[in-house]
Amino acid sequence: MEMIRGRGIPNGVVQVPNLSANNLLQKFFIASNHFCQRDSEHGENQQEAKKREDEAEEDEKDVELTLGLSLNGQFGTDPRSRKRRHFELGRSSSIPEGFVFDEQRSGGGNGGDMRRIVGRGGSDMFQLDRTRSLPVVTEMDIEKERKVSEKTRAFMESPVTNRGAYLTKDKNRGQAVETEKPRAFLEFKIPPTKEGKKEKDRLVVTGPVNGKGKNGNTAKKQKNNVENSGMEKARNILEDMPCVSTRDVGADGKRVEGFLYWYGGNKEEVKIVCVCHGSFLSPAEFVRHGGGTVSDDDGGDVMINPLRHIVVKLPSSSI
């Protein structure tokens, strides 16, 4: 057996049976056929391997779109993929750590050499931290709250110039504020309207205060007119309803008094109100109420007109 070296063969050697020098052509054909057979087998193996890779890539295209999450998982990729480590998006921590490099985690010095730190931990610089569940207060919000608090503090500590008082920071400051509030409320004046001004002008009496001058006696005359009108009303009432009393004295030695509530031309139309009881009585009932006797036409003492036993007090005498 002879050993012939060739390219594209795993061992690079082909065993050929011993042949004479005349059979060199046969030896060449045997080696060529063997090489072609090996090349065809190797090509088939490469095609099968390529086909398997294509199928694996097609499987990787079926992305898992579920919302399920897991620790140290990935989002939107197939966990069974062989290329997962090249496309995965690792879950970051909920608490942002900032740019903490390897040297800082190990506690080496005060940060060590910055170039060495950046060189070893450069990948950490571009990692995205996971957003927090709670809303993050921005610097603008913090600055706005600080300005509002400063304005409020300055307003509370500023002097009150309009009221003529200065509020200090001592313990009596609260009492001063409480006393200034009602004073400001009392000093507030409502501007008069046109109707109120007209009413005020109508009620104001023109003329000097001491009563001298052209219209000096106006107030005094108005007062006298009010008094006179009151007396006139009382006189009219007494004239309409004059006071009456019984002529005879009763058993208790007193006369019964009342006043005429209404009267007309006939005696049946006269009504007298008793002062002691407030009852409406006829003239005969009023005389009987005072202790007198009123008889019918058939019996003993006849009082044809009971008004003779009633005394009417005129307004001039009552006043």
Curated annotation (Swiss-Prot):
Induction per UniProt is: Up-regulated by abscisic acid (ABA) and salt. Down-regulated by cold and glucose.
| Similarity field | Belongs to the Ninja family.
Look up and give the organism this protein is from. Arabidopsis thaliana (Mouse-ear cress)
Q: Where is this region: Disordered?
A: 39-63, 99-120, 205-228
- Assembly description: Interacts with ABI5/DPBF1, AREB3/DPBF3, EEL/DPBF4, ABF1 and ABF3/DPBF5.
Subcellular localization: Nucleus
> According to its record, what are the GO cellular component terms?
nucleus
Question: What is the protein's given name?
Answer: Ninja-family protein AFP4
> What does the entry state regarding organ or tissue expression?
Predominantly expressed in roots and seedlings.
Q: Provide this UniProt record's keywords sorted from A to Z.
A: Nucleus
Which cysteine residues pair off into disulfide bonds? none
By its UniProt entry, which InterPro entries does this protein fall under?
Ninja_fam, Ninja_motif, TDBD
Q: Which portions of the chain have biased composition (kind: Basic and acidic residues)?
A: 39-54
Q: Which domain of life is it from?
A: Eukaryota
Q: What is its main location?
A: nucleus
> What gene name does this entry carry?
AFP4
Q: Which GO terms describe its biological process?
A: negative regulation of abscisic acid-activated signaling pathway; regulation of starch biosynthetic process; response to abscisic acid; response to salt stress; signal transduction
Described by its record, this protein's role is as follows: Acts as a negative regulator of abscisic acid (ABA) and salinity responses.
The record's note on what follows loss of this gene reads: Exhibits insensitivity to abscisic acid (ABA) and salt.
| One Pfam entry name | EAR
